[in-house]
Amino acid sequence: MPLNVSFANRNYDLDYDSVQPYFYCDEEENFYQQQQQSELQPPAPSEDIWKKFELLPTPPLSPSRRSGLCSPSYVAFASFSPRGDDDGGGGSFSTADQLEMVTELLGGDMVNQSFICDPDDETFIKNIIIQDCMWSGFSAAAKLVSEKLASYQAARKDSGSPSPARGPGGCPTSSLYLQDLTAAASECIDPSVVFPYPLNDSSSPKPCASPDSAAFSPSSDSLLSSAESSPRASPKPLGLHEETPPTTSSDSEEEQEEEEEIDVVSVEKRQPPAKRSESGSPSAGGHSKPPHSPLVLKRCHVPTHQHNYAAPPSTRKDYPAAKRAKLDSGRVLKQISNNRKCISPRSSDTEENDKRRTDNVLERQRRNELKRSFFALRDQIPELENNEKAPKVVILKKATAYILSVQAGEQKLISEKDLLRKRREQLKHKLEQLRNS
């Protein structure tokens, strides 16, 4: 690089070496190698991007079995997997082998969907779409199944195993199906453990006439009606013929757990009020149920005037019984008075207006009398006799001074009166002496 000559302190070769793994020297990844080999048109880049993140479905697989014909998976798969009459649907494979391989690959997802709704129904397609969106698409599963079937078929041809006997129509005979059913009956799982509710409205399940018959596809309404009509009924097993597989101890325990769960879910219907009234009537005799306690009635009654939600928490004290009774009676009287006031709001308003009017009149009279008394006091004071604008404080002060002066003059006059009386007494006594002499 030419920059290495001008900048000696900076070694750009080392920098290039550090970032060299991020550059590709005329080497481009061939994303379309598989498509070119298969002579297909290369897809859009968006599809390749999604293909990089594509995940194959990996649900938990059930244990491998000899044949899947005796399990409900065959019944469900037969309803949406048609078979041709000319090639038997699988070339050198029997229908039982094909079903076993498909069931092991798919993990029973499509089989479980067939129990819920009809495969031809639109809801079944929607359910498949929803389920496959969770597992990254249905196309990957279909492609994987086709590749696995091709590999199994090639391995079967290489091994040179003879093909099973076929009937006149190109399909395996019914005796082979029945033989496979009876041979693998002990290895199958009881369908009642997986699906406890019966598929039809009748009390007993109808056995299929032949393995080629379509599966039962009950609607949701029939399932709900059967579940509601018999919530405590024992689950009915599903099968292709009259023989039911033997149940082990684990199966019986699982059935008991299912029954217990159904009992928990079931809602106990209470006795209607009419029947309760009949049972509580005197005609029922000694067997009649006692009526509800008053505590229940008290709880049902919700007073709206006894609790204030905006108030702080109350700090009530435990009073004696007598005091509590008095308080309760006082509360009742207060409630009655409040109710009376609330009953006639117009009368209370008129009473308040009348009372206010009378109070105003009395207050006016009191003020007028006080004013007249002040005027009279002012007239008695010589200094303020002609002063009409004299304030009340001046009137009171002058009146006090005038009263004190009047009291002092009174005492002086009383003392003079006493002196004059004594003088009179002396003069009278002297006059008497002059008369007698």
From Swiss-Prot:
InterPro entries for the chain: bHLH_dom (IPR011598), HLH_DNA-bd_sf (IPR036638), Myc-LZ (IPR003327), Myc_transcription_factors (IPR050433), Tscrpt_reg_Myc (IPR002418), Tscrpt_reg_Myc_N (IPR012682)
One Gene Ontology MF term: E-box binding
BP term (GO), one: DNA damage response
Annotated Basic and acidic residues bias: 266-278, 315-331
Role summary: Participates in the regulation of gene transcription. Binds DNA in a non-specific manner, yet also specifically recognizes the core sequence CAC[GA]TG. Seems to activate the transcription of growth-related genes.
Miscellaneous section: This protein is synthesized as a Gag-vMyc chimeric protein. The sequence shown here corresponds to the Myc homolog fragment of the chimera.
UniProt keyword annotations, A-Z: Activator, DNA-binding, Host nucleus, Oncogene, Transcription, Transcription regulation
Low complexity biased stretches: 207-235
Subcellular location field: Host nucleus
Annotated region (Disordered), positions in chain: 201-358
CDD domains in UniProt: bHLHzip_c-Myc
Spans annotated as Leucine-zipper: 413-434
Compositionally biased spans, kind Polar residues: 335-347
Residue spans of biased composition, Acidic residues class: 251-263
Protein name, as recorded: Viral myc transforming protein
Domain called bHLH: residue spans: 354-406
GO CC, one annotated term: host cell nucleus
